[in-house]
Amino acid sequence: IEDVAESIAAHLRESAVVLHCAGARGPEELRACARHGAATGVMHPLISFPSSTASPSLRGGTFTVGGSPRAVRAARRIARACGARSTLGITTSPAYHAAAALLANGAASLAFSSVTILRSLGFEPRSAERAMAGLLRSVADNVEQLGVPQALTGPIARGDSETVALHRSALRRIGRPLLEAYDALGPVILQCAQAAGLDDERAEAIKRAFRSRK
């Protein structure tokens, strides 16, 4: 970003607004443009871009914006023109970008694991992918409508340790990496369940199910 900023800075008018879209970098990356009078800022899309040649729909998405007041105003106008929302946030923190990556990259990777399980059971690849995509959309709807942690569903959310044990036994037979992924997520899901009101007794039963070697 800094190299590009250096290359264009001398060609900018003082009325220019320059924005970059990197979520883990702040507006200081554009300091060369700022020195030439441009308003600088960040406009990071909380939208997944899986391809460098095809742009996803921006409508309904959210941009996190930051920078000088003039740059922020311009970024908000661009977001509205795209049919998207904008929110003023701390875009200079790698932790902010980690939050976005954890969800976007984690969801895609978990979909890969889930599709792998379904394919081992005889699902056609595209049928499995469409099924998991529909499930992901329903989760997104629940997060938007109910918020977190209320959007959490499933056996850990209701303290069903017997079903957790059945899941682990089945995954152990399919492949240890899948069981390891399930076990790694267990404490995170349990933390969410407890925030939603799962009582201590059932939480302990869930922990025992994860410790079991069966």
Where are these regions (language model features)?
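A general structural signal for well-ordered alpha-helical segments in protein cores
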Residues: 1, 26-27, 72-75, 99-100, ...
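Rossmann-like NAD(P)(H) cofactor-binding subdomain of soluble oxidoreductases
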Residues: 1-54
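Internal alpha-helical scaffold of NAD(P)-dependent oxidoreductase catalytic cores
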Residues: 33, 39, 54-145
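Acidic/histidine metal-binding catalytic segments
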Residues: 125-132, 178-182, 203-204
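Short acidic/histidine-centered micro-motifs embedded in hydrophobic/aromatic stretches
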Residues: 131-135, 184-188, 206-209
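Interdomain hinge/lid region at the active-site interface
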Residues: 141-202
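Short, basic/aromatic-enriched C-terminal tail that caps enzymatic domains
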Residues: 198-214
